[in-house]
Amino acid sequence: MLLIEWNKKFNLTGITEIRDIYIKHFGDSLMLYKGIDGTKSLIDVGTGAGFPGIPLKIAGYKNKVVLLEANGKKASFLEHVTDTLGLEQIFICQDRAEIAGREDIYRERFDVSTARAVAPLNVLVEYCAPFIKKDGLFIAMKTDKTELESAKNAMKQLFLEVYKIESQTIPFSDIKRCNIYFKKIKNILDKYPRADGIPKKKPL
């Protein structure tokens, strides 16, 4: 498996056993497949080793998928694996969310944004909301919904409201997951996202 080979050199993921990779990475990612319209454009923010973006593409996601990853080694892995697998309509952007979210080619251009093991929810909201269009969806992949309370102000500032919450168990495991879907009710203010590093240092 490419992920295991590259992980030995570049530490792409802390999950190293092949069964755990299939369950905790692929199984977790694919639980989104039924919840997203595959004809919608998608950006996977802080994708790391390509989760959930690459499994969604392998499963047949039809529209454009952009994998956003700031780490150069991880971005190189993503280029290699997408080329090796011959995946179409999938693109790699090596950049910080706070920077890419201000670029015209990415800002409010997507129907869906996803984020997995990236940051606390009140930070993720500022990372991900700038990429989605009005009426678009941001999906936060979490273990539970306890972070919603601390994210209320960020949601208000970025014009997001909870659309639905899906609590599931990853197949072939007892691992609980909670996918929180947010809908963007209007376009965000020009001041968001704030400068590189600020959302993490001073969450809304």
Give each language-model segment a name.
Residues 49-62, 126-129:
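Conserved SAM-binding loop of SAM-dependent methyltransferases across substrates and taxa
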Residues 94-101:
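Conserved SAM/SAH-binding loop
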Residues 101-112:
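A short acidic, Gly/Pro-enriched loop at the edge of an enzyme's catalytic core
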Residues 64-69, 140:
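Conserved SAM-binding motif I beta-strand of class I
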Residues 152-204:
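SAM/dcSAM-binding transferase cores
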Residues 1-39, 43, 73-90, 195:
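Class I SAM-dependent transferase core
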Residues 135-145:
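Conserved beta-strand signature within the Rossmann-like core of class I S-adenosyl-L-methionine
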Residues 122-137:
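A short glycine-rich, Lys/Arg-flanked "PGG" loop and its adjoining helix->strand segment in the class I
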